[in-house]
């Protein structure tokens, strides 16, 4: 039961962290707006709430001496994944802080980056928050006011990571993975791989056929030239 709860919390944190990274990449782009800045704030706060819940659950379990060896190994694996999610969140929060300073919304002379991306991010934020539609309530100067809060929250995440290392010592290199790197992607990739593979095979076949024809033409031309030259040499002699 506890293991399933930890996995569910970790899955939620991973999803929200991924959504946050997606939105951070749009800061300063043509999709940037006041709504985006509010979505970023709510999403990162949601991620921090999930991080605290994950930390509390996993810390309690890993410090429990009655946990079996097999279960402890599984919880240590979850702990490593959780630590990685937290590191990624901190990196993206720092990136959001830098881009927020670099691209304030209410400075008309500051040109936005033409990233080629278009459309809003409300759908991504709604998935992260597990709501049907996002509600926007922030002030018009959220892009400036929120930067100080973001800086404080970055420090809080850093302190959390430090406390985690002090309370639970799980070196990442001691934890064995349950599957090969990228194995979780194979199931999704293989769905479309067969159709794509068939197309690529047909393309390769047609390309090979054309190559054979060209090679035959070139060989024939060289052979004809050689015969003509031989005849000319015989006549001249």
From Swiss-Prot:
Signal sequence range: none
Superkingdom of this protein's organism: Eukaryota
Bilayer topology annotation: Single-pass type IV membrane protein
Subcellular location: Membrane
A GO biological process held by the record: detection of light stimulus involved in visual perception
InterPro entries (UniProt xref): RGS7BP/RGS9BP (IPR026512)
UniProt keyword annotation of Hydrolase present: no
Tissue expression from the record: Expressed in a variety of neuronal tissues, particularly in sensory cells including inner ear hair cells, photoreceptors and dorsal root ganglion neurons.
Coiled coil location: 29-58, 135-169
Keywords: Coiled coil, Membrane, Signal transduction inhibitor, Transmembrane, Transmembrane helix
Residue ranges, Extracellular side: 234-237
A single Gene Ontology CC term: neuron projection
Transmembrane keyword on record: yes
TM helices/strands, residue ranges: 213-233
Cytoplasmic side stretches: 1-212
Family designation: Belongs to the RGS7BP/RGS9BP family.
Biological role: Regulator of G protein-coupled receptor (GPCR) signaling. Probably acts by regulating the activity of some 'R7' family protein (RGS6, RGS7, RGS9 and/or RGS11).
PANTHER family: R-SEVEN BINDING PROTEIN (R7BP) HOMOLOG
Protein name: Regulator of G-protein signaling 9-binding protein
Lineage: Eukaryota, Metazoa, Chordata, Craniata, Vertebrata
Gene that produces this protein: RGS9BP
């Amino acid at each position: 039961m506890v293991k399933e709860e930890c996995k569910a919390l970790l899955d939620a944190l991973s999803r929200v962290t991924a959504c946050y990274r997606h939105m951070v990449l749009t800061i300063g782009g043509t999709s940037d707006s006041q709504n985006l800045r509010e979505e970023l704030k709510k999403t990162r706060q949601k991620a921090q709430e999930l991080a605290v819940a994950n930390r509390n659950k996993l810390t309690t379990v890993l410090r429990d001496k009655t946990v079996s060896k097999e279960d402890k190994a599984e919880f240590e694996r979850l702990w490593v994944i959780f630590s990685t999610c937290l590191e990624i969140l901190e990196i993206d929060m720092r990136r959001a802080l830098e881009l927020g300073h670099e691209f304030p919304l209410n400075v008309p002379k500051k040109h936005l980056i033409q990233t080629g991306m278009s459309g809003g991010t409300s759908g991504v934020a709604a998935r992260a928050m597990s709501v049907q539609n996002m509600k926007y309530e922030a002030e018009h100067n959220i892009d400036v006011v929120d930067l100080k809060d973001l800086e404080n929250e970055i420090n809080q995440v850093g302190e959390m990571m430090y406390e985690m290392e002090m309370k639970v010592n799980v070196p990442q290199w001691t934890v064995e993975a349950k599957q090969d790197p990228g194995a979780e992607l194979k199931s999704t990739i293989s769905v479309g791989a067969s159709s794509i593979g068939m197309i690529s095979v047909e393309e390769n076949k047609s390309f090979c056929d054309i190559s054979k024809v060209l090679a035959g033409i070139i060989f024939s031309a060289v052979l004809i030239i050689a015969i003509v030259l031989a005849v000319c040499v015989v006549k001249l002699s």
